[in-house]
A protein has these predicted regions:
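Conserved active-site tyrosine of GNAT-family acetyltransferases
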Residues: 36-41, 124, 158-165, 222
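Loop/turn-rich, solvent-exposed surfaces of beta-rich toroidal or solenoidal domains
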Residues: 205-209
Length: 293
């Protein structure tokens, strides 16, 4: 779907970004902030945002340049999994092992695979954790992708939706046993929608937040079709129905918090700590984890 423009240095189009410039956060509600802290902060080694939502009823957990928003309500489990890039999988394994005793009786588990670690949160959300590598560009800590499971036959229409309605690029459909739509949503970030024949439960209410350069075109599309969930307010709007851009057929449900680049939080720097820093083995000057700007 992307026109390849060759230059002396190779494929110039490979450096293009589309209208979606950043996947900023994934929001899933959790019923217990203490268990969430054991998993996201102690286990995964992420960083509780020191500036925003510091009450006991919500937590923003930073992962490089992205976040998890974890307000207190009944648990939301998204169909699929979340990809993470973490700097040290051996340290991750030690941390996950250390929290097992505190997460007994929940759905928490973890498994070391050949090239990644699978971690399941106390309520069933799946995380696949990798070390930095070429497939993730220059990301050394962050959320490179989120993969959602969708009904058979939906991938092509979803790809067309993101390309034509949201202006995303690059957009591709990888065919095979389980076709998957791959949507570029900023520097080293993707949304993936993989077809499955397995039964899919009802939409749980989770959402994602993205920043877009042109917000009016997609807003007009949804407004004309009565698909706006929350109108423009504070430089953002919300929708949740992904539809075929031609026929209007519903393809999947995923709430999007769509923010313009005029939003005051665009470009907000995220604090990330060094999770290997401990009181017993303290190393002066190594409290912070520094990510490339």
């Amino acid at each position: 779907m992307t026109t390849q423009v060759m230059s002396k240095n190779g494929t110039a189009a490979a450096d293009d970004l589309g209208n979606i410039v950043e996947l900023e956060h994934v929001n899933v509600t959790v019923p217990n902030q203490i268990l969430a802290t054991w998993f996201y902060i102690v286990g995964l080694g992420l960083t509780r945002d020191p500036y925003m939502n510091v009450s006991p009823l919500n937590m923003w957990a930073n992962a490089g340049g992205a976040e998890f928003h974890l307000p207190t309500r009944g648990p939301q489990v998204l169909p699929g999994h979340i990809g993470l890039v973490l700097p040290d999988l051996e340290a991750l394994k030690q941390r996950l092992g250390s929290v097992e005793q505190y997460l007994q009786g929940t759905r928490f588990s973890w498994t070391a695979k050949k090239d990644h670690v699978v971690a399941i949160c106390p309520w069933g959300n799946e995380f696949r954790c990798y070390t930095p590598g070429a497939e993730f560009g220059d990301m050394v800590l962050g959320m490179p992708y989120v993969e959602f499971l969708v009904k058979p036959g939906a991938a092509k229409g979803i790809a067309q939706f993101y390309e034509k309605v949201m202006g995303a690029s690059p957009v591709a459909v990888k065919n095979g046993k389980d076709p998957v739509a791959v949507i570029g949503v900023g520097h080293c970030q993707e949304l993936r929608f993989r077809e499955t024949s397995e039964p899919l439960g009802e939409y749980a209410g989770h959402h994602i937040a993205v920043y877009v350069a042109n917000i009016s075109a997609s807003y007009d599309f949804f407004e004309q079709r009565g698909l706006i969930m929350e109108g423009m307010r504070g430089h953002q709007y919300r929708f949740k129905e992904i539809v075929d851009p031609e026929s209007g057929e519903p393809l999947t449900t995923l709430e999007h918090e769509v923010r313009s680049l005029q939003h005051p939080m665009f470009g907000r720097p995220f604090v990330n700590r060094n999770p290997n820093q401990t009181q017993g083995g303290y190393r002066r000057g190594e409290d912070a984890f520094l990510t490339p700007v």
